């Protein structure tokens, strides 16, 4: 607890390659002590088996938390609700590969007993993007250059060439 800040943070480490049971929220209820109670967990909301600390909607709803910050999903869900408990996967601050496209960042705002008012704040220095370029009847290098948007050097691109070029493509160009 951090009474000087009016809150308590409840969490647990992910200490093994797999956590196949919810040993954190199952049976947990935040005390009614006047503090704002925030849960901070790496876990997966699922009704089925998971290797990544499966969390049930029933356990979340019964937790009495004022907000549950979840990690595992690398895309931001925005603030959602299970029962009276607001929760979100905030995503990750930087994409790590082409399976994590688009804006990455964090959630910032206020959590109170009445709810969570949080906004997504873009943070990533670079975004991963996939772009298709039809190279039929043209110079592939010129077509790719023309297709790249202004500021493309700020991001990381996978360029997928489609179609049939008029001449063989040389990797040196």
Positions of predicted regions on the chain:
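Accessory, non-catalytic peripheral segments of nucleic-acid enzymes
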Residues: 113-173
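His/Asp/Glu-rich metal-coordinating catalytic cores
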Residues: 1-88, 92-105, 110
């Amino acid at each position: 607890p951090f009474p000087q800040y009016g809150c308590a943070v409840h969490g647990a480490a992910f200490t093994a390659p797999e956590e196949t049971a919810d040993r954190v929220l199952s049976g947990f209820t935040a005390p009614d002590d006047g503090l704002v109670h925030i849960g901070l967990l790496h876990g997966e909301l699922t009704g089925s088996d998971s290797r990544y600390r499966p969390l049930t909607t029933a356990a979340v709803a019964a937790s009495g938390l004022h907000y549950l910050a979840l990690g595992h999903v690398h895309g931001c869900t925005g603030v959602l609700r299970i029962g009276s408990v607001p929760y979100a996967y905030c995503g990750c601050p930087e994409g790590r590969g082409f399976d994590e496209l688009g804006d990455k960042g964090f959630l910032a705002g206020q959590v109170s007993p009445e709810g969570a008012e949080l906004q997504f704040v873009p943070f990533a220095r670079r975004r991963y993007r996939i772009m298709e370029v039809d190279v039929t009847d043209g110079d592939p290098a010129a077509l790719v250059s023309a297709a790249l948007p202004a500021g493309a050097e700020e991001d990381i691109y996978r360029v997928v060439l489609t179609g049939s070029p008029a001449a063989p493509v040389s990797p040196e160009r």
